[in-house]
Amino acid sequence: MKNYLLQIEYFGKNYCGWQRQSHSPSIQEELEKALSKIANQNIEVTCAGRTDTGVHATSQVVNFHSDADRNLSSWMRGTNALLPQGIKILDIKEVDNDFNSRFTATNRTYNYIIYNSAISSPILAEHCLWENRQLNIDKMNQACKYLLGEQDFTSFRSSQCQSNTPFRNIQKAEFIKQGSFIVFEVVGNAFLHHMIRNFIGSLLKIGLEFESPEWIKLVLEAKDRTKAAETAKAHGLYFVGVEYPEFSFRRRVIELFC
């Protein structure tokens, strides 16, 4: 039995998220279906980070076990031929049998893309959040400092979050302006349900100068979801990287746009 690692990219619009659901198509379902056909046996996959409905990935990492006699090229080319256009395998390699794409990971990286322009773009509409008002990035980055470290993120978790603990460790949270794009990059050991999109909703209020950077500190201390702003839309969020003890994968979204 061999253990295979896949690096995959997907456009999340037409899917109910990563996880298999009975009522709607999912990334997991499509990938397992294609792999199972190539292997001629049932294949189950594990991913580094389960994304929600409408969220995209440029560098999701998946692993699966199989004893099917296939070389790496056959796995990749055959599976890609069966996958829908919105999901593709970028790379494949064999890894140790004890490797688990979820539990072996040490941290995960997400990007949230904001198109900050007076006029919206029809082409970019499904790929990033449009904000026509000018954002104060300096103040947004001042607020980001309060998100760093290991702390209780109750104020930024959804009511449907199933995690046993609200504590997470955020190693990086930063906005970078690249032309008309504003890219939020956040790195953490793991994330709560809707956590990043809830960050964005509140940080936008600061960028629009409705709140001060210090307001984020008060929201965190309240440990109350109702004290934070509304959840930002899903289509601006991308899973872009994951780090393991021996290797890492990362493809920033802006590299695809520029």
Curated annotation (Swiss-Prot):
Q: Which GO terms describe its biological process?
A: tRNA pseudouridine synthesis
Enzyme class of the recorded protein, top EC level: isomerase
Q: Where does substrate bind?
A: 110
Please give the Gene Ontology molecular function terms for this protein. RNA binding; tRNA pseudouridine(38-40) synthase activity
Known InterPro entries for this protein? PsdUridine_synth_cat_dom_sf, PsdUridine_synth_TruA, PsdUridine_synth_TruA_a/b_dom, PsdUridine_synth_TruA_C, TruA/RsuA/RluB/E/F_N
Q: List the disulfide bonds.
A: none
Swiss-Prot/TrEMBL keywords: Isomerase, tRNA processing
Entry EC no(s): 5.4.99.12
| UniProt catalytic activity | uridine(38/39/40) in tRNA = pseudouridine(38/39/40) in tRNA
Q: State the active site.
A: 52
- UniProt function note: Formation of pseudouridine at positions 38, 39 and 40 in the anticodon stem and loop of transfer RNAs.
Self-association and partners: Homodimer.
Question: Its family?
Answer: Belongs to the tRNA pseudouridine synthase TruA family.
Record-given protein name: tRNA pseudouridine synthase A
